Amino acid sequence: MNNILLPPINIPFTLFETISLFDDFSADDMQYGDMVEQDFLSLGLSDISAKVDPYRLIKYHFPGPGSINVAFSASSSGTKISQRECTDILFAEMKELAKMFSFFGQYKTLIEDLIEHFRYGNGSNFHSQQLNLSFHEKINKYGYNSPIRIIKECIENGINSTPSTGYQPLILQSIKTKLLSSRLNKFNDFEDSFNGLGISVHDISAQKISLLSFQNYAIGWSATIHFVAQDHFGLDVTDIKNKTYSKYRFFRIWFFLQRHKDFAFKPFFTNFNTIERIENYL
């Protein structure tokens, strides 16, 4: 057996890391409780909920004003409620609205877990075996420009060019270079728009790919790769200015609960990872 990983290569070896940092608390989507009513109105967010006016703590006697302007909303018939009651209604409405993005497949209830964590987790990190499994499945969809396919191809080419040793510095440098132009795995396929993954992890903020082991044998080779990713379960101003988000009440409620100074529910980091073994034998 020829072990490709000879000194000075240190394991784990970073093959790729996004410019975006892990644990970036300074990101705008990680801010909370930093806005007042006027800030929301300036963003066109007068209509938050179909059930309550969260600015005035009024529960509507009938379905909310929809797209009707704030002047009508303010004078709508309703009952004064406490902030706790308003919070309960908003979170229940948020869960119900999430179903339009999460109604099929084994991950359809994942968003409910995230909403619960948003309310009660106090900003702590979120981990889920479901997310790890979904990331594993996503990684192993061998698209033309997928990272795992590029890594395997670089190893194959490197070993074929130097079969006796598999000259590791050239192989690793080739992987690092080609990963720069790869298509990172995200939950943005068509099915993710309704299976619960797109709404649960609407983007991946940071990713890291590391080599854990890499060995060359007389009859083939094997490598173990660690894929680590992090999303922010939070919304920034750019998100809510985007019509793709702001047209849905789900995101307006989310943004309100996070950013209004009187509610200020903390966003959090969603962490997931998978370890993949790739190999080829004669």
Describe the residue ranges of each PLM region.
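Membrane-inserting hydrophobic helices used for pore formation or membrane fusion
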Residues: 2-198
